[in-house]
Amino acid sequence: MSEPKASPAREVWITGIGLATSLGEGLDANWEALNARRINVDEKTFAPCIVHPWMPVNFDTQIAKKGDQRQMEAWQRIGTYAAGLALDSAGVKGNKEILGGMDMVIAAAGGERDLAVDIAILNAAAKGNSDPGFLNERLMNGLRPTLFLAQLSNLLAGNIAIVHGVSGTSRTFMGEEAASVDAARIALARIAAGQSDIALIGSAYNGERLDLLMLYEFGGFNLKDGFVPVWARQNNPGFALGSAGAFLVIESKAHAQARGAKPYARLTNVVADLAQRTQPGAVTRSLEALWNKLGVHDGNGALITGATGAEPVTSEEKAFLRQHANFAVRATGTMFGQTLEAQFPLGLALAALSISHGALFPPNDPTGLEVEMSKPPTQIVVVGAGHWQGEGMALVEAIE
């Protein structure tokens, strides 16, 4: 008896993009800023640390109810807002039939904190004023009830469902940069296999938080004492946190065509790895192995990376990039900062946007690693190497 033949994988298109970043709101604002080589950094508020602050928006345009806005913390508002932009871009905003079957596969961090309560508890403990019931009393009476909602990672998806009506299946991944790689990988695999027709993928990050800066300072990851582009940080390694929301709508070619949707690009493949970074060169080897699995072909290619500027991962990624010098490189960390879970979907968004414009945005790098690309890119590889663990790669291609 012959084995049944497996169905061919379905083609998957990117049909919607939502961006709200330190460079602005929407695709036009971000594209214009990239082409103007504009960078928005704040070197004073959190000095000596540096952040890429979120560009203020009118939340009412995507989150109509003030009550919904109040029960979210900043990272959830950023994400819910950017998700709405992606749905608008895809032409499905308010379409209950499509939204009712739209799946969500997103990445999220662990929520935000009330710094005033944290500081009061720590100060009391330092002065010896914390009796056995003090901590519970402060947590019960000092925290507003809605803060507990902001602590739940899966409530980013919950808020998107409530505000925008996206009510298919929902999956939330945690794990910094690697989480968003897996979110994209699994969403793509499900659509390609016929288990899903359309999905919303992405993440959001609020980098303007003292508690996060403190945590990354413990690891020696923060860029301090002046901004320089990612590739020029050898003598002062580290990353500048950035605030951003990046979401995409991806769907099968057949589903998109049936509703008359115009694609930005094709999402061809997403692959992931978790290198054991105990030996020098582990990241270089991991990225090369992913490249070989990706299906990159000869032609006009570019490479958009979420390189952080932290070491030793950035130097090891550079070694990989030098092996593929025929691909024009762009580092999102220079323009947008390190946006953790949002870094990989940001790269996907910029890749699709570049392909749809028929041009790669210009380099913003004094070292010469990034070079001009005169021809329209037909394929863009998106690279995500986490600042301390996790590697991922995606292939975004033009649709002929």
Describe the role of every protein-language-model region.
Residues 1-169, 173-174, 181, 189-193, ...:
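Conserved "HGTGT" condensation-loop signature of ketosynthase/thiolase-family condensing enzymes
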Residues 186:
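Internal active-site segments that recognize and position negatively charged phosphoryl groups
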Residues 198-200:
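Paired acidic/hydrophobic, glycine-rich loop segments that form the ligand-binding mouth/hinge
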